[in-house]
Curated annotation (Swiss-Prot):
One cellular component term from this protein's GO annotations in UniProt: extracellular region
Keyword Cytoplasm tagged: no
UniProt KW keywords: Antibiotic, Antimicrobial, Cytolysis, Hemolysis, Secreted
Presence of keyword Acetylation: no
Protein name stated in the entry: Grammistin Pp 2a
Biological role: Has lytic, hemolytic and antibacterial activities.
Family designation: Belongs to the grammistin family. Group 2 subfamily.
BP terms from Gene Ontology: defense response to bacterium; killing of cells of another organism
Tissues expressing the protein: Expressed by the skin glands.
Compartments, record wording: Secreted
Amino acid sequence: FIGGIISLIKKLF
């Protein structure tokens, strides 16, 4: 879901 994608992006960056 949206929240999950944002969390992954924050972990990558």
